[in-house]
Design a protein with these regions (language model features):
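Glycine-rich FAD pyrophosphate-binding loop
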Residues: 26-47
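Glycine-rich active-site loop/strand segments that organize a redox cofactor
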Residues: 51-91
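C-terminal structured subdomain/cap of oxidoreductase catalytic cores
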Residues: 22, 32, 248-249, 374, ...
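An anion/pyrophosphate-binding glycine-rich loop and adjacent beta-alpha core
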Residues: 293, 302-410
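N-terminal Rossmann-like FAD-binding beta1-loop-alpha1 element of flavoenzymes
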Residues: 8-33
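Conserved redox-cofactor binding core of oxidoreductases
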Residues: 92-246, 267-268, 415, 419-442
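Glycine-rich loop(s) and the adjacent beta-strand/alpha-helix scaffold that form part
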Residues: 204-314, 510-513
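A glycine-rich dinucleotide-binding beta-alpha-beta segment and adjacent secondary-structure elements
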Residues: 410-493, 497
Length: 532
């Protein structure tokens, strides 16, 4: 078996892995980054939104008054006790510096504030309310502020985020070994992690590597939207890896950082830990198979929050849809419609088996048709058209309920309650509508496999880490020497509750933490050793 040596070996080249590599290299370590495919991971297929606040330059440019305390008090409601108060406070206090650090590494942001509530803004806007900050029950506890900092680029800008981070990695001379899958950690007799065994295609024929690269790219996108296509392409990827992969032993003199993503692409793990979440769209790549978590567990690492999955049932854009009522088959309200999509999805799955209908009247439908184009990305526009085509329409509340299979009396009661004063779910008054203009429509927004109206899902749990260093903790709570984890391979800021941008922000936060501390661990590479 051939071998290589580095100070720090990083498994995974998404946002967490890239940030870990940059920090480790800046601390003086010789770094080797591995990626099963060609880098980017789930970060590259994301929207490129980074959650930040406390007075960033972009917020100031937009005239937004925000503070570290306001950000902290809001996130405390979302995060709960998944991380300590000290860690969350440190995350919030370092938020403005995080954006500056990303900008220093070539990632562009802009303070163009989105004037309407949306799940993801159009290319005119790059700062927006990306969570439930202004929703009922939150706005009174913490001063709301837009904190979704979208990377400035067309469409879903995660690809630009990763392009710039990858460039920053390579500018530092950090070595990246693509098309290399980590298989097992190397652990010495005292439990210290000293390296990783991989299977690499680096010596495979060029045509084979090109085919593998192309298949993996198509499996990531558009395969993300067509699971059967992804499955077929991934089988071909695995055949290439089995035939041409060569085993390689890589020693890490200071540490290994697991930044290999979550496990949303591993349907068996999803079935085991979160069986109610099997009807969504796996947001990520085929490499989000839990392999990083598995390797950490095999080395003695503990896990937590594996049952936590973010399922985004967005009803915007356009923002006019927020005036509707989200109801169950009993006709009762499900949640404040202005809440973030993951909160909506969680409530629907936990309490209503993923089923729900959005009631709108003719006035809202007219606004939706008027605003859809100006408030939507192309893919959001397709979803709006799909929803309008699939809606059930009738002249009265009772008739539309019967046509949709919703209890008429329950629906009428919900509408009357929403008109009577303070909204029963706490929906802010600026989103409330009288719903008094027939005809009425009920739109099926149930969570199920549906290309026209998919429900993206992302796993949130992972390996338990030391919150000061990012070192993986054992079942006894002791840090495992030489082993670190970051991003969705680890428990982090967003592992209890997710809002847009919080996962990427945690990838930056935890990746930098793991990279910096792994670079300080143990000895360094002898310059005469076989360094990649």
């Amino acid at each position: 078996m051939d071998s290589l040596v580095a100070d720090v070996v990083i498994v995974g080249f998404g946002a967490a892995g890239a940030c870990a590599a940059i920090e480790a290299a800046d601390a003086g370590a010789r770094v080797l980054v591995l990626d099963r495919f060609s880098g980017g991971g789930a970060s590259a297929v994301s929207g490129g939104v980074v959650y930040a606040g406390g007075g960033t330059a972009q917020q100031r440019d937009a005239g937004v008054d925000d503070s570290v305390d306001a950000m902290y008090y809001y996130l405390r409601l979302e995060v709960g006790d998944v991380v300590s108060e000290e860690t969350l406070r440190r995350f919030c206090a370092g938020s403005t510096e995080m954006i500056s650090w990303l900008e220093g590494n070539g990632v562009p942001f802009e303070g163009s504030l989105c004037p309407y509530k949306t799940s993801y803004p159009s290319d005119k806007h790059y700062l927006y309310y990306s969570g439930s900050e202004a929703a009922g029950g939150f706005r009174d506890a913490a001063k709301p502020a837009p904190r979704g900092h979208r990377v400035k680029g067309p469409g879903t800008s995660g690809k630009l985020l990763m392009k710039r981070l990858a460039e920053a990695v390579r500018r530092r001379g950090i070595q990246v070994l693509p098309q290399t899958a980590a298989r097992n950690l190397i652990v010495d007799a005292d439990g210290t992690v000293t390296g990783v065994v991989v299977s690499t295609l680096r010596d495979a024929p060029a045509r084979v590597r090109a085919t593998h690269r192309k298949l993996a790219a198509y499996a990531a996108k558009p395969g993300i939207y067509v699971p059967s296509l992804r499955k077929s392409l991934h089988r071909r990827v695995e055949r290439i890896e089995r035939r041409y992969g060569r085993e390689l032993r890589i020693s890490a003199s200071r540490g290994v950082v697991l930044a290999a993503g979550g496990f949303i692409a591993n349907r068996e793990m999803v079935r085991e830990h979160a069986p109610a979440y099997r009807g969504g769209l796996a947001l990520g790549t085929s490499a989000d198979d839990g392999s990083g978590i598995r390797m950490g567990v095999e080395a003695g690492g503990a896990t937590a929050e594996l049952g936590r999955i973010s399922a985004w049932r967005f009803i915007t854009p356009p923002s006019a849809f927020l005036g509707g009522l989200l109801v169950s088959e009993t006709g009762g309200r499900i949640i404040d419609e202005s809440r973030y999509g993951a909160a909506v999805g969680e409530r629907m799955i936990a309490d209503h088996e993923g089923r729900g209908w959005l009631l709108v009247d003719d006035a809202i439908v007219r606004e939706v048709k008027r605003d859809a184009r100006g408030q939507s990305q192309w893919f959001q526009g397709l979803q709006v058209r799909y929803l309008l085509r699939q809606r059930v329409v009738a002249g009265s509340l009772e008739d539309v309920a019967r046509k949709a299979g919703v209890d008429p009396a329950g629906l009428v009661a919900s509408v009357e309650a929403s008109r009577s004063g303070a909204d029963p779910t706490g929906k802010p008054p600026e989103f409330a509508r009288p719903l008094d203009r027939a005809p009425y429509s009920l739109i099926d927004v149930s969570i199920k496999p549906n290309l026209g109206y998919p429900c993206p899902m992302l796993t949130l749990g992972g390996l338990v880490v030391d919150e000061e260093t990012g070192a993986v903790r054992s079942g006894a709570g002791v840090p495992i020497r030489g082993l670190y984890a970051a991003g969705r391979t680890a428990v982090g800021i967003c592992s209890r509750s997710y809002v847009s941008g919080l996962s990427l922000a945690d990838c930056v936060f935890s990746g930098r933490r793991a990279g910096a501390h792994s670079a300080l661990d143990r000895g360094s590479v002898d310059k005469n050793e076989n360094v990649f």
